[in-house]
Curated annotation (Swiss-Prot):
GO BP annotation list: endocytosis
TM helices/strands, residue ranges: none
Gene: ART10
Protein name per the record: Arrestin-related trafficking adapter 10
GO cellular component: cytoplasm
Keywords of this entry: Cytoplasm, Endocytosis, Isopeptide bond, Ubl conjugation
Length: 518
């Protein structure tokens, strides 16, 4: 009967997943029902990333009309690998002086403990990157990525093409026990036999090691997409490549320290499919879709995220748009308040109008419904071919008029001119809504397609998120919808660390003294 091996890992410090400050440790249990010749027992801590990308039919035809054979493009990166021998002990191993003679181990139960150092900060694969390696990160920005799609095998059991293509990228960490048996005396079995047992685990680095560095050319403006242009993004497409109206210029590939990397993440991930040939990027031709490109600006030290399009008003001359103003909407941690006053997320939302003030003040403009979506874009890269996957999570959908409050969410009596007098604005007080002000992000620690909600970027996998705020309006009895996209938003599955001021010591009155009578 074969030996029975079990691996018991010590729990992580936070009780949920292993992080940068943890040391992987545990016990290997070995049960033998009969004597066995064992040369050594090793414990291996390792992690790897793997991607598979495909080329769609339009790329299989060259300019001369010949058909290029299709093939899968695979990429494998070793993120880390550490080995520790637990049997025989060091003093015995050193005394063997290279001898391959095995040990005869009697039947019974044996336990071997192991412990590794803290997880490295950078992946091991960086030393293998060359000038021809095209990656999402530079050497300086590369960090050990979190676990991703560790349950990818379950996706293949589901009749769902979305999950099938989503499983083409994975980051897996494991502890592997390897038992090397003694050499067989038979001439037809001349090699050592290996027995292996594997235990996977979830690893998510500290937030500081998950932060995605901003693109050097995109600090001044963000690309926003209209609801029409991202229609296919709301429900994940079944095709290999989802439709997009962005094309990637060749300037977005840059060589840093001898390694090519994608300089403009946003354009690259939104492109339908990308083929890199001799440093030149060609994007798949897509149908023409109207989109609106909006840029952010600063107002009183706050970033302003405008709606992707303006809505015409009934007088035929005026229009309105929505603006979200925030100082810190680019990063959201789990259990962060989304609409609460002081949250710096959606607590400052304004309706900005252009037109005649007398005409505007007579209109009946009422917010009716609100929907907040979290949009995921996951991109896999392999041998110059990138495939994108889009999906959407509905965070909340609410009827704004279901619960009446003492003060309306939008009071046009408070309309005022903006700082330069060219427009009028009025605050939409979503922070005063009794339900929205209590809403926190990802309170239940939701797993989307088997993965916690976190943004990350590694050599060949990039997972980014954006927020989409949809508001349905009633304007003089006519229903219209506004859309604001915050793209991208850094998402963390950890709870934000709140630095609390140390409480002052309690005041203790000094003792009183009385003179003793002489």
């Amino acid at each position: 009967m074969a030996p029975k091996i079990s691996i018991s890992l010590n729990p992580p410090y936070n009780g949920e997943f292993y992080s940068s400050n943890d040391q992987m440790s545990g016990i290997v249990s070995l049960q033998l029902t009969k004597a066995l010749s064992i040369r050594k027992i090793s414990v291996i801590l390792k992690g790897f990333s793997e991607t598979l990308t495909k080329i769609d039919q339009e790329y299989m035809f060259q300019q001369n009309g010949m058909m290029m054979p299709g093939q899968d493009n695979k990429s494998f990166h070793t993120l880390m690998k550490f080995e520790q021998r637990v049997f025989p002990p060091d003093n015995v191993w050193n005394a063997l002086d290279g001898s391959s003679k095995p040990f005869k181990v009697k039947p019974g139960s044996y336990n071997y403990s192991f412990q590794f150092d803290k997880f490295p900060r950078k992946p091991e694969c960086l030393k293998n990157h060359t000038a021809k390696t095209v990656a999402f990160v530079t050497r300086s920005n590369a960090r050990l990525p979190p676990t991703f799609n560790s349950h990818w095998q379950e996706f293949n059991k589901i009749d769902n093409l979305d999950l099938y293509f989503y499983s083409f990228g994975k980051v897996i960490y494991m502890v592997q026990v390897q038992i090397e048996l003694g050499k067989s005396s038979s001439w037809f079995k001349p090699f050592h036999k290996l027995i292996r047992e594997i235990e996977t685990f979830e690893f998510i680095p500290e937030p500081k090691d998950l932060i995605i560095e901003p693109d050097e050319d995109d600090n001044e403006e963000l690309n926003a997409f209209s609801n029409n242009s991202r229609g296919n993004s709301m429900v994940t497409n079944n095709e290999f490549f989802n439709s997009s109206n962005l094309k990637v210029p060749s300037k977005d590939v840059k060589v840093v320290n001898g390694v090519g990397y994608i300089k403009s993440d946003r354009n690259f991930s939104q492109a339908n499919s990308i083929l890199i040939e001799n440093g030149d990027i060609r994007s798949r031709p897509v149908s023409s879709v109207t989109s609106t490109r909006q840029s952010t600006r600063l107002v009183n030290g706050m970033k302003v995220f405008p709606s992707t399009y303006k809505m015409g008003l009934p007088d035929g001359e005026s229009n309105m748009r929505i603006e979200v103003r925030s100082r810190d909407l680019k990063q959201i941690y789990r259990k962060d308040y989304l609409f609460r006053s002081g949250s710096q997320n959606f607590d400052k939302v304004y309706v900005v109008m252009e037109g005649n003030i007398a005409s505007l003040s007579k209109m009946q403009i009422t917010p009716l419904k609100l929907q907040l979506n979290l949009l995921e874009t996951t991109t896999y890269l392999s041998q110059g071919i990138a495939n994108g996957n889009y999906s959407s999570l509905k965070l909340i959908e609410i009827d704004l008029n279901q619960l009446k409050s003492n003060k309306p969410l939008l009071d046009l009596n408070e309309i005022r001119e903006n700082f330069d007098g060219s427009m009028f604005e009025c605050e939409l007080r979503l922070k005063d809504h009794p339900i929205l002000r209590k809403l926190v992000f990802n309170e239940e620690d939701y797993r989307h397609r088997g993965n916690r909600l976190y943004s990350f970027k590694t050599c060949t996998i990039k997972r980014i998120f954006s927020l989409q705020l949809l508001i349905e309006w009633g304007i003089n009895g006519i229903r219209k919808q506004s859309e604001v996209n915050i793209d991208p938003v850094q998402i963390f599955c950890q709870v934000r660390e709140h630095v609390e001021a140390e409480a002052l010591p309690r005041y203790v009155p000094p003792p009183t003294y009385t003179e003793m009578a002489s």
